[in-house]
């Protein structure tokens, strides 16, 4: 194996020109990845690189996945930092494609219904990143059925996330962050497994306020 990726027991490894397993930071196809001492690609480098002054976000509508990028030393946003599972708009109310800059954030925001979402970051118009919406402005507001749709198209156009991931964007991505939404955006990390909650559970297990 040379200059190629290999998946072994659920983890990604990269073998360089000499056939040796890559460790540490490495550019592959223009992106900068980190491989542990065991050779496994690390699929969340947030703590490794620390909080950055700026990020860029891409959303892939087909995969229902979000990836956050940081810039390298030359200002190229080529370091995948984190990836999130999301829900985008249903076919009748699709999430718009294009490149946008975030104009506003809200700790809670009134959404369709009305319903209420946490850790909202506006993308464009009425389209926001937000937690799965519930019936009131408390952490105990969810419909399990709604929550369990995360990872597939389910919204009126917004990009739904679990509370942990919506909060990460809210806390870390400054206003003016560039967000690109398409059907073809590269998703360089594996799509995280969705969390399922039992009928009758009304809170998000990733919510730090529960």
Positions of predicted regions on the chain:
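Residue-level signal for short segments within beta-strands and strand-turn junctions
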Residues: 16, 36, 68-72, 183
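A structural detector for beta-sheet-dominated domains
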Residues: 9, 29, 36, 60, ...
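Exported/periplasmic cell-wall-interacting domains
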Residues: 94, 106-210
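Short loop/turn microsegments at loop-to-beta-strand junctions
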Residues: 10, 30, 54, 64, ...
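Extracellular adhesion/carbohydrate-binding repeat motifs centered on closely spaced tryptophans
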Residues: 1-53
């Amino acid at each position: 194996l040379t200059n190629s990726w290999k998946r072994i027991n659920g983890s990604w490894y990269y073998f360089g020109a000499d056939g040796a397993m890559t460790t540490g930071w490495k550019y592959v196809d223009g992106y900068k990845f980190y491989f542990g001492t065991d050779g496994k690609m690390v699929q969340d480098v947030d703590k490794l690189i620390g909080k950055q002054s700026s990020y860029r976000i891409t959303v892939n509508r087909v995969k229902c996945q979000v990836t956050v990028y940081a810039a390298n030393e030359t200002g190229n946003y080529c370091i995948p930092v984190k990836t999130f599972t999301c829900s985008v708009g249903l076919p009748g109310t699709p999430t718009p494609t294009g490149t946008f800059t975030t104009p506003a954030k809200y700790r809670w925001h009134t959404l369709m219904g009305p319903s209420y979402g946490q850790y909202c970051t506006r993308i464009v118009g009425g389209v926001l990143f937000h937690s799965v919406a519930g019936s009131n402005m408390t952490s105990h507001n969810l419909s399990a059925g709604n929550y369990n749709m995360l990872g597939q198209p389910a919204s009126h156009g917004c990009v739904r996330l679990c509370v942990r991931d919506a909060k990460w964007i809210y806390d870390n991505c400054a206003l003016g962050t560039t967000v690109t939404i398409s059907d073809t955006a590269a998703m360089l990390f594996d799509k995280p497994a969705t969390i399922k909650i039992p009928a009758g559970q009304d809170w998000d297990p990733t919510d730090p306020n529960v």
